[in-house]
């Protein structure tokens, strides 16, 4: 029996139990990730958070009005759950896709099914080109990305960047869930900026949200999320390239942990940024 998400995936016993106890999973999720103090994750939205969510809705709606076709590249992380909820509830004109690299965690595929049950909608999945992927694996091996930065970037290009470029073709703007708090590179971003490498505008409506606010929103709205977050995975990507972090580590320390911090991006977040109304260059990832 096929999973419905991912290439020829067979559900595990854990997946079957989760599917049978959907209501019980909300009890598990209510605990939240261990790196977020429980006392700040209230059961209702605060006035401040309601205002921030309203600002996100306005930013997204303005993006549709100004740029026409807008698409959200859904990472399926915690921030993605906030944006998915807001888009599907308030700005349905925005399309949503996610990239299935073929190396995602089982919990990520389970999350896709939970979201479909909750919202009665399905996120469009895009995949790497099969010929390019076969060539890549033939050249560097199944896990060749561990051997050098160049090999890892080549893997990310085939599995993520190229499918991403196909998915955003024809759109006037794309939406991302990056936040300043996540890394020094992302701290330089602007809410709306021209994405020169991809030839369209980029909208980052959560840029000034804190992680605590992200989880306050998720808990108050009872939104499904990736259960890896409860195991100290604040940032989740491909299974081989993601690990849990230790207390006190940077939020993205679990991504490509064998590399230097300044290189820990996949290429979807270029570091050449041109904000609307201004421009500045800070390098290229």
Annotate each PLM feature.
Residues 37-285:
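Nucleotide-activated chemistry modules centered on ATP-dependent adenylation/adenylyltransferase
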Residues 19-23, 36-38:
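Intrinsically disordered, low-complexity terminal segments enriched in Ser/Thr
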Residues 1-3, 10-13, 26, 33:
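Short, low-complexity intrinsically disordered segments enriched in A/P/G/S/L with frequent Arg
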Residues 7-11, 24, 278, 284-285:
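Intrinsically disordered, low-complexity segments enriched in Ser/Pro/Gly/Ala and basic residues
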Residues 4, 30, 41-44:
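Absolute N-terminal positional cue centered near the fourth residue
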Residues 19-21, 30, 281:
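Ala/Thr-enriched low-complexity intrinsically disordered regions
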């Amino acid at each position: 029996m096929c999973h419905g998400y991912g290439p020829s995936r067979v559900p595990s016993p854990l997946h079957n139990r989760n599917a049978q106890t959907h209501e019980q999973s909300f009890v598990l999720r209510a605990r939240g990730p261990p790196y977020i103090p429980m006392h700040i994750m209230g059961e209702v939205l605060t006035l401040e958070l309601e205002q921030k969510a309203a600002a996100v809705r306005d930013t997204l709606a303005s993006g549709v009005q100004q740029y026409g076709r807008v698409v959200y590249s859904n990472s399926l992380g915690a921030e993605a759950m906030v944006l998915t909820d807001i888009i599907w509830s308030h700005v349905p004109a925005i399309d949503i896709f996610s990239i299935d690299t073929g190396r995602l965690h089982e919990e990520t595929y389970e999350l896709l099914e939970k979201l479909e049950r909750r919202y009665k909608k399905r996120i469009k999945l895009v995949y790497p080109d099969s010929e390019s992927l076969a060539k890549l694996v033939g050249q560097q091996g199944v896990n060749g990305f561990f051997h050098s930065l160049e090999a890892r970037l080549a893997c990310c290009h085939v599995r993520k960047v190229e499918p991403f470029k196909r998915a955003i073709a024809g759109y006037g703007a794309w939406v991302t869930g990056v936040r300043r708090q996540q890394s020094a590179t992302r701290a330089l971003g602007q809410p709306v900026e021209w994405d020169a490498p991809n030839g369209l505008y980029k909208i980052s409506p959560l840029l000034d949200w804190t992680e605590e606010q992200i989880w306050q929103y998720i808990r108050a709205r009872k939104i499904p999320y990736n259960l890896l977050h409860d195991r100290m995975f604040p940032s989740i990507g491909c299974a081989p390239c993601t690990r849990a972090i230790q207390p006190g580590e940077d939020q993205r320390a679990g991504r490509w942990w064998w590399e230097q911090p300044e290189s820990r991006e996949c290429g979807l977040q270029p570091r050449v940024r041109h904000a609307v109304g201004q421009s500045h260059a800070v390098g290229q990832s």
